[in-house]
From Swiss-Prot:
One of its GO terms (cellular component) is cytoplasm. This is Acetylornithine aminotransferase 2. Pathway: Amino-acid biosynthesis; L-arginine biosynthesis; N(2)-acetyl-L-ornithine from L-glutamate: step 4/4. Keywords: Amino-acid biosynthesis, Aminotransferase, Arginine biosynthesis, Cytoplasm, Pyridoxal phosphate, Transferase. GO terms for biological process: L-arginine biosynthetic process. N(2)-acetyl-L-ornithine binds at R141, S282. It is found in: Cytoplasm. May also have succinyldiaminopimelate aminotransferase activity, thus carrying out the corresponding step in lysine biosynthesis. It catalyses: N(2)-acetyl-L-ornithine + 2-oxoglutarate = N-acetyl-L-glutamate 5-semialdehyde + L-glutamate. The modification N6-(pyridoxal phosphate)lysine is found at K254.
Amino acid sequence: MSTATSSTTSQHHIMGVYNRAPLAFERGRGARLISTEGEEYLDCVAGIATNGLGHAHPALVEVLKAQAEKLWHVSNIYRIPEQEELADALCANSFADVVFFTNSGTEAVECALKTARKYHSANGQPERIDIYGFDGSFHGRTYAAVNASGNPSYVDGFGPRLPGYSQLTFGDHDAIKAAIASPTTAAIIVEPVQGEGGARSIPTQCLVGLRQLCDEHGVLLIYDEVQCGMGRTGKLFAYEWAEGGEPHIMAVAKALGGGFPIGACLATTEAAKGMTVAAHGSTFGGNPLAMAVGKAALEIIKSPETLDNVKTVSGFFTQQLNGLKDRFPDVIVDVRGKGMLIGVKLIPNNRDFMVLARDEKLLIAGGGDNCVRLLPPLNLTIEEASEAIAKLEKACEAARAKAAA
């Protein structure tokens, strides 16, 4: 495979925080990407669950162009009608009453964490600052978010960890109950389906149980649906699978903008009671350009056509991947996840396997627990899914041959 990406550019002036593949793209359409070398790839990464409707979706392109000719940015010191419209739509389709708009998922998580602590302060309990996440979680790269995740890879070397952040282990019910019952606990934060942690889907009864425990002890439940929300599980929001397990606060982003930078922190009126004037803010959050695209993306994603397609195609994927697992037990250990957030746990190194898939012109993402993730556009067709399976089959054959060599 060619490692060339451009004859006129280099990474010399780019901070070296990314382990990039030797590959660059110049255009895309739907689930297809065309490299700078002119080669076509089937994209089952979708910007890590961000290009929810694929690349250059005509409806989003049209809305973006129309809004770009009118107004890009004004300050939040003024009313922004496009922001109000998207907030209305999000609240009408979720548990939430109010929304704060950001530019990314990690900013939405930061807002959620601040909202939770401010709630208890407004209730006359400022000592309630402790926030518990779970092992294997990923909540973003800003400082509170990495402390909520607790992954040493993301927090080591940056000085003292923030006080008030700890992690729990799924299945350790005694520790979970004790944490929630503590008089200094402010909130629990959880991904209903973990993404970076290896596509681990939290059982619905666990989410319902968390909500019940939180309500008993006055603790707020925060869901991070930055990756698993916006239709990826076959419902608009992943929490909808757990009746009675809805959150008090939720962070969303990624597919909400269809690839355009956007994020949102959703909350009930009660949970957001402490977020009064000047409690939080954002320069670019809620700008008219992002809001116009977000509203258009939401309308398409929440449609029965899109959500039914996710259920149909993800069911096909799961069936076919389990077939590959049966045929290649020396390569595939497990198939897991929910909807189009699919994890495949491997025996060979997942990064090596990603290269084998890329050799077949298939793009897949890495994940924790030696998984690779399939995160295709929500409108992927059965034919495209079948093509992806055929490419994965060839990658499995190559992995087997490599191990035998």
